[in-house]
Design a protein with these regions (language model features):
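N-terminal subdomain of nucleotide-sugar transferases
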Residues: 1-62, 107-108
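An amphipathic, basic-hydrophobic alpha-helix
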Residues: 49-51, 55, 63, 69-112, ...
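A short, histidine- and acid-enriched strand-loop-helix "catalytic/donor-clamping" loop
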Residues: 12-14, 119-122, 129-144
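A cross-family glycoside hydrolase active-site/sugar-binding cleft signature
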Residues: 39, 116, 134
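Short loop/turn segments at strand-loop or loop-helix junctions that form parts
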Residues: 7-9, 67-75, 136-137
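Short, polar loop motifs at secondary-structure junctions
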Residues: 43-44, 117-121
């Protein structure tokens, strides 16, 4: 298990617990000589895939490949009051996950994937891929 692709529906850099946890996991995988690639969507104007920026923001020295993917769905940055905020988020998450998994499987020969995303896990699993799925709590979607 030397090559690991970590696909997540988060944005980086960010002060959220999820983003901090993801970087921590990747940092320790890299410390243990694993070749890691992080893939995430460009959902925010603050999103950045420059490893030097991430190292400065999170305070680590390890290196790994970082790819910010295009996020062209109309569910980006939920400013203002929206009655459909959660629904829009899930639709966007579903569509992005389906697209990114298809793309990664076409151009990547990774043997192991790591994710916190329900939809990324679903699409990788449907394609018989080896997936490490990190889950911290049961959600309504996961119960479904």
């Amino acid at each position: 298990m030397n090559d690991i692709t970590y696909i997540t529906y988060q944005t980086f850099p960010a002060h959220t617990a999820n983003s901090l946890q993801t970087i921590s996991v990747i940092k320790y995988l890299a410390r243990n000589n694993k070749k890691v690639k992080l893939i995430f969507p460009d959902r925010s104007s603050l999103s950045n895939d420059d490893i030097n920026e991430l190292q400065n923001f999170y305070g680590f020295n390890e290196t790994f490949e970082v790819t910010k993917t295009h996020h062209n769905y109309p569910f980006r940055d939920y400013l203002g009051d929206s009655n459909f905020k959660k629904v829009r988020f899930h639709i966007s998450h579903f569509l992005w996950s389906k697209k990114v998994v298809k793309k990664v499987l076409q151009e990547n020969n990774t043997k192991t994937y790591f994710t916190r995303s329900d939809w990324v896990f679903y699409f990788l699993n449907r394609n018989n891929q080896k997936v490490i799925y990190e889950c911290h709590q049961v959600s309504k979607l996961r119960k479904f």
